[in-house]
Amino acid sequence: MNKLQEIDQEITYWYRERLKLLHPLRQLFWECTLRCNMACRHCGSDCKTVSNVPDMPFEDFTPVLDEVRLHQPHIKTMVFTVGGEPLVRKDIIECGRTITEKGFLWGMVSNGKLIDSYMMNELSDAGLRSLAVDVDGLRDTHNWLRNDNNSFDVVYNAIGHIKKAPHLIWDVITCVNSRNISQLEEIKRMLIEAGVTKWRCFSIVPMGRAKDDEELVLSNSQYRYLMDFIVKTRMEGKIQLSYACEGYLGDYEGLVRRSHFLCSAGLTTASVLSDGSISGCLSIRSNYHQGNIYKDDFWNVWQNRFDKYRNREWMRSGECADCKVFKYCQGNGMHLRNNDGSLMFCNYNKLFNSK
């Protein structure tokens, strides 16, 4: 790590300490449905076409929006509708329109299957400002991961409609696994030719359907290759590639994404799950819920709970007990913790302390 990286790392540490005290809510995720029109191999939520958990009525979520707007009117909070697949909700356009009318920025994460010209126009007219869609490889590897032989063609067509939308910040997400990692150069060329300017690469966490699927999890050498590929691509400057927000990456910090690692869950990010549970980010599938909107005042929960998120000293156990980089890592992302507090895996060790 060079001197500039070390300085940025210290700045990030003190910035995190400040956020622990202030915790401004900048991102609010609403799990608006657990229904999905796909059955992806890596789904962390194990979503299905018909969910055992009904969609939350939008009128149950709107009081949360009103509380947030009342208590921090000066902050432009981004509200993300996620699932499942949010576009399977018949009222999603009206939900987004109301979110926008209440003074929030509206964002969405979608598999792209239902995005055509008409849908994109409807989303834009309702105020959509941020959108992420998935392209998980070339045709064969994308369709394999998505368990759908038509998925690649559909999402590729969707990109053509998305890039025409005005005032929209959008990017493509690729979940990198052992099948598509050898295709990264080809995927990069394909995305650039399709007019994609922003690209994010994720590694797959062993949870949900991916828990026991070894093909989805990168080996240590593959993980290092991914980091080196991102560094090289960022230096080329042909497409804005970054690694996902998960995990402390040691010497790669500041090189594979715009800022150094900082798990924003409970600091600037909260989520309302489909059953009303209040949590950090929706990538957290373990039970670190802090309350429920059907029983608790959301803003009171945000202000006065979330101690496990804001004070990470409880994570100094197991492989984190004597870790020399704990000050900067803070026990890794909350989504990488099991219910018992143990760490699923360590990004830093995967990169630097493996044989």
Would you name each region that the model predicts?
Residues 35, 39, 43-46, 266, ...:
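Cys/His-rich metal-chelating microdomains
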Residues 4-19, 23-24, 283-355:
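Flexible mid-to-C-terminal extensions adjoining Fe-S/redox cofactors in radical SAM and related proteins
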Residues 13, 181, 205-286, 326-328:
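A C-terminal junction/extension of Radical SAM enzymes
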Residues 58-81, 89-204, 215-219:
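Radical SAM/AdoMet-radical enzyme domain recognition
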Residues 2-31, 41-42, 89-91, 95, ...:
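Conserved N-terminal glycine/acidic-rich loop preference
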Residues 39, 83, 273-275:
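Residue-level recognition of short loop/turn positions
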Residues 22-59:
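Canonical Radical SAM [4Fe-4S] cluster-binding loop centered on the CxxxCxxC motif
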